[in-house]
Amino acid sequence: MYAASREALTQTRAALSSALGSVSAGAATAAAAQIGAELFSVVEILDEQRTLRSALSDTSTPGNVREGLAEQVFGGKVSAETLAVLKAAVGQDWSVTSDLLNSLVLVGRESLLKAAADQGQLDAVEDELFRLGRIVAGNPKLEQSLSDRSVPAKRKRELLSKLLYGKVTAVAEALATQAVGRLKNSAPADAFDELSNLAAAQREAVVAKVRSSAPLSSEQSDRLTATLTRTYGKPVTVHVEVDPELLSGLVVRVGDEVIDGSGAGRLAALRKSLK
């Protein structure tokens, strides 16, 4: 994302904060959830209507004119708070049209995560999205159904919604179903991992992805979390995936850093040293 779009995103986020600040404290959580859901709906419409999205992102047209068009099209169809965020976004000069749409999605996600945080559900949302990624990655048939470009986005969302209904938080379901209908070049599991990481980022936590040769006990998990928290100097979320092929031990990945303490890793290192 170029400088112009980065500044436009900053202004759009500021508009979200302002919109949420304009409602009463008791209504802020519901407003955040509504803004997120409605921004997703707006993007879905813009994805389908090339002429409209081009008009709303045309930098040769004055920003106030683009804002007026947004109000003409979406006024009365979304809340006043959502419309304020949308008008702020289209009034900015974005480097490319895709930056506008992707940023509306991002701000929508952040708004939904704000609602989850207000309800004390942010940790649950993060964990649910991570586990969903692992489930999909381990189910080739489901992964194919969700990633098949010949399947309409609406049908993919309906499929995932049926699978998730009543099993995860409303925010996790909303985030996941939106993402699966707009995968572009991402695999479904990767998209869900990205959402999980975004949830962790909302509470300034580091995500540690751990592969273990066997399930960790609660005590082992707590000890690992405490060790990583001391190492990185900030809260750490530990996501554990069991992988018997490791033979023993753990592989811990934090960002681009990998700590391989597995039996398979030690064997590989030994083989390399003997060459």
UniProtKB/Swiss-Prot annotation:
Topological category with respect to the lipid bilayer: Peripheral membrane protein
HAMAP family the UniProt entry points to: ATP_synth_delta_bact (MF_01416)
Job description of the protein: F(1)F(0) ATP synthase produces ATP from ADP in the presence of a proton or sodium gradient. F-type ATPases consist of two structural domains, F(1) containing the extramembraneous catalytic core and F(0) containing the membrane proton channel, linked together by a central stalk and a peripheral stalk. During catalysis, ATP synthesis in the catalytic domain of F(1) is coupled via a rotary mechanism of the central stalk subunits to proton translocation. This protein is part of the stalk that links CF(0) to CF(1). It either transmits conformational changes from CF(0) to CF(1) or is implicated in proton conduction.
Pfam families: OSCP
Record InterPro entries: ATP_synth_OSCP/delta_N_sf, ATPase_OSCP/d_CS, ATPase_OSCP/dsu
Family from the record: Belongs to the ATPase delta chain family.
Subunit (UniProt): F-type ATPases have 2 components, F(1) - the catalytic core - and F(0) - the membrane proton channel. F(1) has five subunits: alpha(3), beta(3), gamma(1), delta(1), epsilon(1). F(0) has three main subunits: a(1), b(2) and c(10-14). The alpha and beta chains form an alternating ring which encloses part of the gamma chain. F(1) is attached to F(0) by a central stalk formed by the gamma and epsilon chains, while a peripheral stalk is formed by the delta and b chains.
Listed GO MF terms: proton-transporting ATP synthase activity, rotational mechanism
Record GO cellular component, one term: proton-transporting ATP synthase complex
Name of this chain's protein: ATP synthase subunit delta
Gene3D superfamilies, per the entry: N-terminal domain of the delta subunit of the F1F0-ATP synthase (1.10.520.20)
Keyword tags: ATP synthesis, Cell membrane, CF(1), Hydrogen ion transport, Ion transport, Membrane, Transport
Compartments where located: Cell membrane
